[in-house]
């Protein structure tokens, strides 16, 4: 993203042919159009009389206005606006037609008169006057602007500015530095961990020893301690200043062994199982002569930390998982097939194209390996070391998945944010270089199979992914804590910013969601299905916790093999096909006879898990057969009109469950008021409700589903994928937007 070398084209354009009878600009009222700027944001270049393509080929829905490039975003200020929808969630940092520069993947300029096109990179020249600008975005949107009435020189300058500022060569050129320098300097003491005091649970940032101490106590890791030898980043440049190590390892030993590890990344404690088994991650040992000695010392220390003194299992991730280059190549192919060409043509080859991308295969591989690690911790009661050359990519994925499967705390909103902060941000994942996607897709698979076990929704995961392209948060802006500290100090020094008691600029974390959304909009993150420890119900006057019982029918989807009475795919002459439930029993009894290889202990562990009722506050294992995995449609296909279901999809169940949950909360409040509970008489239920969709004051009147609901809710594929905000769309807009995909043309195959 910030490398000096320009990346090769990664997108194909699937847009209608250029129009020869373009409409002229209508007679618009003269009014001053100004972009709304954030603190530290400045206008770099702009062009007037620009047409933004919205949907239909006729262009009747297109918008006219000013195209502005700032040091933060591409902003389009329109003379007129699309009809206001009944549903409107407002992003506090971005307007309706704003695109963060960090979200721009490619900038394509076109001159339809000369038949020229060019993919612009940073500091490149443009030898023709563009008549059209196409922006390919990392969130799968495609944005088109026409310069038919704009000045040729201003059109060229704004295109060059967008290409230049969307690919900065220095991280300090990111808008976040100017934003923090202007807005957050001098706010020390007013915020704690990026959250206003009194604002509820705070997400630990793990940048101090107290956060790690609390995590040790929470997991019961009594034989582990907080290590401070990396304060000032003197030992390892990519490790945090505070991390957890075995009690039996002295600081002097760690300093001595650090030089033997790749990038001096000594072993890091991740999590402790209730049995005492520990999950540890570490980089490879770079010194072959010291490898045996150091491995024995580390393994011995981890063994001593286990109450049963169990052995240590080493899991080599580099040998068992695809590398980061393969994952990025799969993501690139997935992007190309998600930007649908002709819907009729792509529908026929969708499954084969998806399979050839290998994306779902890689997702399944990561899930399977995480299950194997869970087996070692849960069934074998041994500690596990995750080995990776640099310990900054694959380890982040596996350690997070293991904790999501084993620890119900990580499936709460607060716990999940702490997990990402601990295993990705503080562990030194290269967000600046990678802008990784796999972590979200794997976790979405778990959410999809056990939605009632997670406090957050699919919308939350999608918005969290989109936040990577808003470069004002420390969470996804740097490769490691040291890089953040160094760049912050250098920027403050160059701008003569007095830091006071702070050692560096204090960037807000993404976990302070009030930076982006109102409290009402944040209720879209709350899952009405969540069965947590605090989710209780009243039954016969007593409080009972919600429980979940697994249907025995689900077992049939996990069984492998065929019944022994079937020969060459057919039944014997005297056999009949029994009911599904009895077929399951026959499959179970004959499973051992048809297996070519004996069942491994880990496979038996998985089979036993699915034969029992699932405890949503306990261990969760994912279904791993291909039929159980699915593409994350809300994230990858939300901007494709043909892929949407107006007034349908999972959101219809979400709406009804939200209303039902809100009604239960309302009745509970009324019951407490009836019993005379203190401080509840004047409490407004609507103000404190956790649900976005609320029940009516009279339970007899069930609210009808809103007309703006669709399977892409709360995102909107209006027109030419042009609306980035969380906006609703009526059916008419879907139909208008669908017309843009009927014709195709390739713009990115050639460069000039």
Swiss-Prot record:
<dbReference type="InterPro" id="IPR036004">
    <property type="entry name" value="MTMR10_PH-GRAM"/>
</dbReference>
<dbReference type="Pfam" id="PF06602">
    <property type="entry name" value="Myotub-related"/>
</dbReference>
<dbReference type="GO" id="GO:0005737">
    <property type="term" value="C:cytoplasm"/>
</dbReference>
<dbReference type="InterPro" id="IPR030564">
    <property type="entry name" value="Myotubularin"/>
</dbReference>
<keyword id="KW-0175">Coiled coil</keyword>
<dbReference type="InterPro" id="IPR010569">
    <property type="entry name" value="Myotubularin-like_Pase_dom"/>
</dbReference>
<dbReference type="GO" id="GO:0004438">
    <property type="term" value="F:phosphatidylinositol-3-phosphate phosphatase activity"/>
</dbReference>
<protein>
    <recommendedName>
        <fullName>Myotubularin-related protein 10</fullName>
    </recommendedName>
</protein>
<dbReference type="GO" id="GO:0016020">
    <property type="term" value="C:membrane"/>
</dbReference>
<comment type="similarity">
    <text>Belongs to the protein-tyrosine phosphatase family. Non-receptor class myotubularin subfamily.</text>
</comment>
<dbReference type="InterPro" id="IPR029021">
    <property type="entry name" value="Prot-tyrosine_phosphatase-like"/>
</dbReference>
<dbReference type="Pfam" id="PF12578">
    <property type="entry name" value="3-PAP"/>
</dbReference>
<feature type="coiled-coil region">
    <location>
        <begin position="652"/>
        <end position="683"/>
    </location>
</feature>
<dbReference type="InterPro" id="IPR022587">
    <property type="entry name" value="MTMR12-like_C"/>
</dbReference>
<dbReference type="GO" id="GO:0046856">
    <property type="term" value="P:phosphatidylinositol dephosphorylation"/>
</dbReference>
<feature type="domain" description="Myotubularin phosphatase">
    <location>
        <begin position="206"/>
        <end position="636"/>
    </location>
</feature>
<dbReference type="InterPro" id="IPR011993">
    <property type="entry name" value="PH-like_dom_sf"/>
</dbReference>
């Amino acid at each position: 993203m910030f490398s000096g070398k320009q990346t090769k084209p990664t997108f194909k354009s699937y847009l209608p042919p250029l129009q020869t009878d373009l409409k002229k600009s209508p007679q618009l009222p003269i009014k001053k159009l100004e972009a709304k700027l954030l603190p530290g944001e400045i206008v770099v270049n702009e062009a007037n009389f620009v047409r933004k393509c919205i949907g239909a080929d006729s262009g009747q829905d297109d918008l006219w206005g000013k195209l502005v490039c700032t040091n933060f975003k591409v902003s389009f200020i329109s003379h007129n606006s699309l009809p206001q929808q009944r549903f409107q969630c407002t992003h506090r940092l971005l307007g309706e037609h704003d695109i963060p520069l960090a979200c721009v993947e490619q900038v394509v300029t076109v001159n339809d008169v000369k038949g020229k096109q060019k993919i612009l990179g940073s500091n490149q020249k443009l030898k023709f006057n563009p008549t059209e600008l196409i922006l390919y975005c990392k969130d799968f949107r495609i944005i088109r602007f026409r310069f038919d009435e704009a000045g040729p020189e201003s059109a060229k300058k704004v295109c060059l500015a967008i290409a230049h500022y969307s690919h900065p060569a220095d991280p300090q050129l990111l808008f976040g530095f100017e934003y923090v320098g202007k807005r957050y300097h001098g706010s020390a003491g007013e915020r704690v961990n990026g959250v206003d005091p009194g604002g509820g649970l705070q997400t630990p940032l793990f940048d101090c020893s107290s956060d790690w101490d609390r995590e040790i106590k929470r997991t019961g890791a009594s034989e582990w301690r907080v290590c401070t030898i990396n304060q000032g980043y003197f030992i390892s440049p990519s490790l945090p200043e505070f991390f957890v190590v075995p009690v039996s390892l002295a600081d002097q030993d760690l300093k001595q062994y650090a030089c033997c590890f790749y990038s001096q990344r000594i072993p890091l404690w991740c999590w402790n199982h209730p049995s005492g088994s520990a999950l540890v991650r570490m980089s490879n040992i770079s010194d072959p002569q010291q490898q045996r000695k150091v491995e024995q010392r580390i393994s011995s220390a981890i063994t001593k930390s286990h109450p049963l003194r169990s052995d240590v299992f080493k899991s080599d991730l580099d040998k068992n998982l695809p590398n980061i280059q393969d994952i990025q190549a799969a993501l690139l192919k997935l992007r190309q097939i998600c930007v649908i060409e002709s819907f009729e043509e792509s529908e026929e080859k969708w499954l084969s194209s998806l399979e050839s991308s290998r994306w779902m295969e890689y997702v399944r591989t990561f899930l399977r390996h995480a299950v194997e690690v869970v087996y070692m911790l849960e069934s074998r009661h041994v500690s596990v070391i995750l080995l990776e050359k640099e310990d900054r990519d694959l380890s982040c994925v596996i350690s997070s998945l293991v904790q999501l499967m084993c620890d119900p705390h990580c499936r709460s909103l607060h716990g999940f944010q702490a997990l990402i902060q601990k295993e990705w941000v503080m562990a030194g994942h290269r967000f600046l270089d990678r802008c990784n996607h796999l972590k979200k897709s794997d976790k979405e698979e778990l959410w999809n199979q056990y939605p009632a076990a997670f406090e957050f929704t699919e919308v939350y995961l999608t918005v969290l992914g989109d936040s990577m392209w808003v470069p004002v948060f420390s969470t996804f802006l740097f490769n490691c804590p040291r890089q953040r500290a160094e760049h912050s100090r250098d920027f403050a020094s160059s701008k003569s910013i007095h830091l006071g008691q702070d050692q560096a600029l204090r960037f807000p974390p993404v976990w302070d969601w009030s930076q982006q959304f109102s409290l009402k909009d944040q209720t879209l993150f709350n899952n009405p299905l969540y069965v947590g420890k605090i989710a209780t119900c009243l039954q016969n006057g007593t409080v009972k916790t919600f429980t979940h019982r697994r249907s025995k029918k689900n077992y049939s989807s996990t069984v492998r093999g065929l019944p022994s009475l079937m020969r060459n795919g057919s039944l014997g002459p005297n056999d009949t096909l029994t009911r599904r439930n009895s077929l399951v029993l026959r499959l179970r009894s004959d499973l051992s006879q048809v297996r070519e290889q004996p069942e491994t202990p880990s496979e038996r562990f998985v089979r036993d898990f699915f034969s029992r009722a699932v405890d949503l506050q306990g261990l969760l294992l994912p279904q791993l057969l291909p039929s159980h995995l699915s593409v994350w449609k809300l994230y990858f296909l939300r901007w494709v009109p043909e892929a949407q279901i107006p007034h349908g999809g999972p959101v219809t169940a979400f709406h009804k469950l939200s209303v039902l949950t809100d009604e239960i909360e309302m009745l509970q409040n009324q019951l407490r008021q009836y019993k005379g509970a203190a401080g509840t008489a004047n409490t407004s239920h609507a103000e404190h409700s956790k649900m976005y969709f609320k029940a009516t004051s009279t339970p007899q009147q069930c609210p009808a589903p809103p007309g703006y609901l669709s399977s892409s809710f709360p995102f909107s594929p209006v027109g030419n994928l042009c609306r980035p905000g969380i906006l609703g769309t009526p059916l008419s807009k879907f139909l208008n937007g669908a017309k843009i995909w009927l014709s195709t043309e390739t713009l990115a195959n050639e460069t000039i």
